[in-house]
Amino acid sequence: MSNSNIDNDLDKIDSLLKKAKSKKIPVTYDDINNALPLNKNPSIRQLEEAILKFSDAGVDILESNEDDEIKLDIGMDEEFKLSTNVDNEPEDEVEEENIGTTDDPVRLYLKDMGGVDLLTREHEVEIAKRIEEGHKTMIASLCRSPIAMRCFIVWYEDLVNEKMLLRDLIDLEANMLHDETPENDEENSSETEGEEHEDNHLSMSRVETQILPNIIERMKKIAFICEELLIEAKKCYEKSFEPKVLQNSKKYNNLELLINEVSEIHFNSKRTEEILGKMYGINRDLINKETAFLKLAEKYGVTRQNFLDEYIGSVINAAWKEKMLKNKKVAWKELMTKESDYIDQMIAELSVIESKTGLLVNDFKKLVNTIQKSERQTLQAKKDMIEANLRLVISIAKKYANRGLQFLDLIQEGNIGLMKAVDKFEYRRGYKFSTYATWWIRQAITRAIADQARTIRIPVHMIETINKILRTSRQMLNELGYEPTATEIANRLSMPLDKVRKVMKIAKEPISLENPVGDDSDGGQLGDFIEDKNAVAPIDAAIQSNLREVTTRVLATLTPREERVLRMRFGIGMNTDHTLEEVGQQFKVTRERIRQIESKALRKLQHPIRSKKLNSFRSGGKRGDGNSSDLLEA
């Protein structure tokens, strides 16, 4: 891209920002998107910088289709116009040809997100009812399965015997938030976001303790109903293969009571998936057996449609085999005759499945199909609710920019919170979904920042303590006019002084030694300015080098023998010093003679002509060469 094009793109952003500030009106994401280069591929950094530029300037960024929003649109001629959108419908959609081809993930994400209409209160209620209806259908279907009944009994026994925690059985958060209505109060959120996790942890523990007796009582009732239903189901299964017998049983009327009790408990997703996993596993095994039987029948000339007509809806047992042996079609007779052992084995395997599920094969398949259909209905409704509120995630995520996570990571974490909000939303409360979801999105983002933003992870409870101390420090700075000391902060928070100092030390952010210093490329890196304790200081290296040179010149004024003796005795220019005995062996003289030569040489060095050259190094102590320093002391 040429410099002129870059300047033109920057001019569009600056022009949009300038006019928005002068008119004191907000902009939308579409306005920023349109101001970016259309037929280019703007990077993620460019998009983030554009959004942050408006946010730092104090210009509000609104959604494209928000109630009663004032929309600022910029065209190619850069003329601005005001319009009010009250019908929650997108007005000035970007033309497809203007978007251009792009493979930038952020641009594509915003484009797809902008194509989904926002929901009115009525639409939110409609989707929430679809989710609720799908969930109710699934719960009702699960309660009709003896597999689920056995699971309920086992869970009750594990809970009573303390083999299972309550939080592993039910959704504690749903119970904890059952009586709370989160407010979308930005001012309060900024003050309390630092204490969310600690309060939530305490609240969940408190809720778990409070509701445990009630849950045990409910589970006891559920287990009792399930035991009665299992006994009745077994009797009906043994007496007759007609499913209507079980349905018409008087004790089976307890099924509605079981459904109501299970719906009130709110089992968590893991427990529901445990039951579904067992049922789906049996269903897959059943499908594999039926598929193998169909392929075998086709080898004998039985058409697929004829096989389905005779197999589907029939109770596969010995009576069915006798019936098919009398079938008028030769293919069936041949199949039943030649594959008699295979048919008997399949009947036995189906009988095992029926005893395991407590239902006839056809009834079990219908039950699984009903559950799968309700799951698809629920997932589609949740998908619609999530896609319609993705703009809300971006509007919240931009407030947490520059806190250690990339903008895209903030969006993804916010989306996770949005999905949790969809699962917990109760439309009967009367408030809009966006009001409820804001709390979940903000919690997901703040938790992600606490867990992932730092290079060295700090536990969440310590993060909250750090935030509390930093918040108190800012308040005291405004009150006192100077930075408060650790003692003053400890007194204000009634916290031990050692703990405050420890937390303030932990709060320091790590910094890379490769960070550039200055604006110039030649400014170097931060690591260049950190002292290396193991390296020789430049002044010490200079003194050592100078001392070595002076010592060499002074020793050169002695006789070669005297110089050699002193060098060996003090280790000057050598790896180590030598004893009198070792030097004597080198010169083949006695120790006493070496001592005399050494004494004579030292007296010569003490002469003012020689000593004045070395005295200047004595003031520096032993910063220079250790061996040369020993010579100075001598």
Swiss-Prot record:
Annotated segments matching region Disordered: 177-202, 608-634
Portion annotated as DNA-binding: 580-599
Start-end of Acidic residues biased regions: 182-197
Gene Ontology CC terms, in alphabetical order: cytoplasm
Region spans: Sigma-70 factor domain-2: 385-455
Subunit description: Interacts transiently with the RNA polymerase catalytic core.
Region: Sigma-70 factor domain-4, residue numbers: 554-607
Classification via InterPro entries: RNA_pol_sigma-70_dom (IPR014284), RNA_pol_sigma70 (IPR000943), RNA_pol_sigma70_r1_2 (IPR009042), RNA_pol_sigma70_r2 (IPR007627), RNA_pol_sigma70_r3 (IPR007624), RNA_pol_sigma70_r4 (IPR007630), RNA_pol_sigma_70_non-ess (IPR007631), RNA_pol_sigma_70_r1_1 (IPR007127)
Lineage: superkingdom: Bacteria
UniProt key word Ligase: no
UniProt GO BP: DNA-templated transcription initiation
MF (Gene Ontology): DNA binding; sigma factor activity
UniProt-recorded name of the protein: RNA polymerase sigma factor RpoD
Region: Sigma-70 factor domain-3, residue numbers: 464-541
Predominant location category: cytoplasm
Pfam families linked to this entry: Sigma70_ner (PF04546), Sigma70_r1_1 (PF03979), Sigma70_r1_2 (PF00140), Sigma70_r2 (PF04542), Sigma70_r3 (PF04539), Sigma70_r4 (PF04545)
Keywords: Cytoplasm, DNA-binding, Sigma factor, Transcription, Transcription regulation
UniProt function note: Sigma factors are initiation factors that promote the attachment of RNA polymerase to specific initiation sites and are then released. This sigma factor is the primary sigma factor during exponential growth.
Gene (name only): rpoD
Subcellular location: Cytoplasm
Family: Belongs to the sigma-70 factor family. RpoD/SigA subfamily.
